[in-house]
Design a protein with these regions (language model features):
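AMP-binding/adenylate-forming domain of the ANL superfamily
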Residues: 2, 108-117, 121-122, 129, ...
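Regions immediately C-terminal to embedded phosphopantetheine-bearing carrier domains
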Residues: 93, 118, 125-242, 263, ...
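A short N-terminal helical cap/helix-turn-helix that marks the beginning
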Residues: 88-95, 136, 150, 185, ...
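Phosphopantetheine carrier-protein modules
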Residues: 20-25, 48-54, 98, 143-166, ...
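AMP-dependent adenylate-forming
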Residues: 1-135, 139, 143, 162, ...
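Adenylate-forming
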Residues: 3-7, 25, 41, 51-59, ...
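AMP-binding/adenylate-forming catalytic domain of the ANL superfamily
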Residues: 50-53, 57-66, 78, 91-114, ...
């Protein structure tokens, strides 16, 4: 190792290595690794800069700030503000120097090298402050939303949403809240284009308010029949088609070690059921369609009588049927619970919800409310929480009012459906992956999972790659998955589904309910393009999809009207799930709580890549947990494990040289490569072409049946095959077909 840092860069003559700097010239700014050489390179691109060097200096506040030193190329000294703006065009916001010092000459060591220790200290009184507070109403609102969505104490004017930990999905929540608070209609794309508090507030302050009016989400009088939300309606239809399928069951099993107060637990769950209406709602059908019937809390029976199990095997035999048992949501409350007693101080609490009542983002508020209620009940009192500002039924009414009808061409629903019809027009019906078995005519929900890991170093490189290209880790992962799917299928027009939380309004944060929607991400992968180009394309694709994510997936399917099949899911067969929802931690007094595998795995499509970020105590990337879920109807674990290996290999390759053509990425390695590599030695195989083999067979036994040419009752001899082949060759020659010509068969 030399310590020199280089990167691949495209040029007219092909890829070249570009020197970036030394690895010992790196600093951490607000948790981000900064290559100082990249800042220097940006500065020296200015015509009036002959030389530049950047250091990390400690400000009086204790923060590390970037200070650049510049030697002018002539007598005309460049303006510091102009240089700062120049640098902004080449590096992310966190790499813009806090100040720039203009030098008359460079301090050198006795051997003629730059003496970094002799560079003058900057005047910290004029250094750009690390934190600038908001002043206007728009700035205050944007800063508050950034802090709220990202779980921070505060956000300053110069803080970048994505540098603070934002991502594609949290960006949609932030924009929705800013729009609601300020009465504007900003899009997710604008947050990517103006990611700092100051920049986005400036756009909000000048945004057109004439088209921004949306009804506020508030508690309001309900009609006699409350309709389902659009997401619930899809769940209801799926459930009525097959009430026995566990595909949309959400099982949660927790091992509680310690003295469990059963009565307090029973009362706590009663409190939670009363607080969250979806947990006590049934959805009967009628001639006018299904509707919500919210039951009184005392009508919901929770049987928490402990059932004794002898060992782990007996525990498993209880959990699996509990997790996979059917719900008929038209008459059954979409929740069941059981307590399994392993010993005096060891229990497993199993909770199963139907997806019509809860999604992944519901787990955190559900866990918090159970904690509060159980703690209160162990002290002999009810939980003292404030009433919910709105309930799920309020959301269902608000959603339908906001989206409007697809029969109204001016409605939001119609506008978004038009977008999807244009975007998905002509998309291939099916992505054919290499499988271990033929696809059955009727797909089942049987699934399994292959977990794998992405190391901390690679995680950090991926984060840096995303930041350098004004994208997010989700977008980089999506692009890498597209490369993998393109290689596996041989296709260039690919579709991947991804869930979106659907919780833009702050009133929905603490609610248990079904808000999630699925959008289709259509990507075109050109082998000659670089990964950098693909990330830019994916960025546009994803931003467009997230900006039109309110129309339910089933309505998109109806509008696009693809060829339907019971053998596969419509529009996409691969799902990408980026789990960046709030972690649901459950801590109960006097108990150690551990998650238990409920033992039921389902496959909603052929392949599902799930990714989750891990960070260390300082917020630095600490690796990613990953898993490929797959349909066992068509795939084996060994095959999917190979997919995982190839995916990690792609991530390594694109972080090492993002400008390399993606068609040049080597996705096969190790044992796979050995299987494909000819073994040196052994029996020699003569290099004889197929026409030569046919000619030899014609001479040796012209009237023998050509085994490769049998169609029904018709069989050709080698002589007949040779004659037919010659006739076809003459026809092609007469048509002007020559070597390397492409001919449709």
């Amino acid at each position: 190792r030399t310590g020199d840092v280089v990167r691949w860069r495209r040029s007219e003559g092909g890829p070249v290595l570009e020197y970036v700097g030394r690895s010992d010239f790196q600093v951490k700014i607000r948790g981000f690794r900064v290559e100082l050489g990249e800042i220097d390179a940006a500065l020296t691109r200015h015509p009036r800069v002959a030389f530049a060097v950047t250091l990390g200096r400690t400000a009086p506040s204790g923060d590390t700030v970037l200070v650049s030193y510049v030697l002018p190329s002539g007598d005309d000294e460049p303006d510091v503000a102009e240089l700062t703006d120049h640098v902004r065009g080449f590096v992310p916001a966190h790499m813009v120097p806090a100040t720039i010092v203009i030098l008359d000459e460079l301090p050198l060591t006795p051997v003629g090298k730059l003496d970094r220790q002799a560079l003058p200290a900057p005047d910290f009184a004029i250094v750009r402050t690390v934190f600038r507070a908001s002043t206007s109403t728009a700035e205050h609102t944007v800063a508050d939303v950034f802090a709220e969505v990202l779980g921070l104490d505060r956000a300053g004017l110069d803080d970048n949403f994505f540098d603070l930990g934002g991502n594609s999905l949290s960006a949609t929540r932030a924009v929705a809240r800013i729009n609601s608070a300020l009465g504007v209609a900003l899009g997710v794309r604008e947050l990517f284009e103006a990611p700092t508090v100051a920049e986005l507030a400036a756009r909000a302050a000048t945004a057109d308010r004439s088209t921004a009016a949306r009804p506020a989400l508030t508690s309001a009088p309900r009609p006699d029949r409350v309709p389902l939300s659009l997401a619930q309606q899809r769940m209801w239809i799926v459930n009525q088609v097959d009430t026995t399928s566990p595909a949309y069951n959400v099982p949660i099993a927790l091992r509680l070690t310690g003295e469990l107060d059963i009565e307090a637990l029973r009362a706590a769950f009663g409190d939670v059921v009363e607080r969250h209406e979806p947990l006590r709602t049934v959805y009967p059908g009628s001639a006018d369609g299904p509707h919500q019937v919210v039951l009184p809390a005392d009508r919901v029976t929770l049987d928490l009588t402990p059932v004794t199990v002898s060992d782990e095997a007996a525990l498993r035999s209880e959990l699996v049927p509990l997790a996979s048992a059917e719900f008929n949501v038209s008459r059954d409350v979409p929740m069941r619970i059981a307590v399994l007693r392993i010993g005096p101080d060891e229990h497993v609490v199993a909770l199963v919800l139907h997806h019509i009542a809860a999604d992944g983002s519901s787990m955190a508020p559900l866990a918090r409310d159970v904690m509060v209620a159980y703690t209160a009940r162990t002290h002999g009192r009810p939980p003292g929480w404030a009433p919910m500002p709105v309930q799920y039924a309020d959301f269902a009414l608000w959603q339908r009012r906001t989206l409007g009808s697809d029969t109204d061409p001016d409605s939001l629903l119609s506008a978004q459906l038009d977008y999807w019809c244009r975007t998905l027009d002509g998309m291939p019906e099916l992505l054919e992956l290499p499988t271990d078995r033929r696809r059955p005519l009727q797909r089942s929900a049987h699934g399994a999972t292959v977990p794998f890991a992405i190391g901390a170093d690679l995680h950090e490189k991926l984060s840096d790659l995303a930041r350098d290209h004004d994208s997010t880790l989700f977008m980089v992962a999506h692009a890498a998955l597209a490369v993998l799917l393109g290689r596996l299928s041989g296709e260039t027009d690919l579709a991947v589904g991804t869930p979106v939380a659907g919780r833009g309004d702050a009133a929905l944060d603490e609610m248990v309910g079904m808000f999630v929607n699925t959008v289709v991400l259509r990507t075109r992968v050109a082998p000659e393009s670089s990964f950098t180009d693909l990330v830019a394309h994916v960025r546009e694709t994803d931003l467009g999809a997230f900006a039109h994510a309110e129309v339910p997936f089933d309505r998109v399917v109806q509008a696009v009207d693809p060829v339907r099949s019971t053998a596969h899911t419509p529009l996409f067969q691969v799902l990408l799930e980026f789990q960046n929802t709030e972690k649901s931690r459950l801590e109960l007094p006097g108990l150690i709580v551990e998650v238990v595998d409920a033992g039921v795995e389902v496959a909603k499509c052929d392949l599902c890549l799930t990714l989750s970020e891990n960070v260390d105590e300082t917020g630095e990337p600490a690796g990613m947990s990953a898993a490929f879920g797959f349909a066992t109807d068509i795939l084996d674990a060994s095959t999917v494990r190979g997919f995982a290996d190839q995916f990690v290999r792609i991530l390594d390759a694109v972080t090492a040289s993002p400008d390399r053509p993606i068609g040049d990425i080597a996705v096969i390695g190790g044992a796979e490569l050995e299987c494909l590599t000819p073994v040196v030695g052994g029996l020699s195989v003569s290099e004889v072409s197929l026409p030569e083999l046919l000619a030899a067979s014609v001479v040796a036994d012209p009237d023998a049946v050509a085994v490769a040419v049998v169609c029904g009752d018709r069989r050709l001899t080698y002589r007949e095959l040779d004659e037919a082949s010659n006739r076809l060759a003459r026809v092609l020659l007469e048509a002007g077909v020559g070597a390397e010509s492409v001919v449709a068969v």
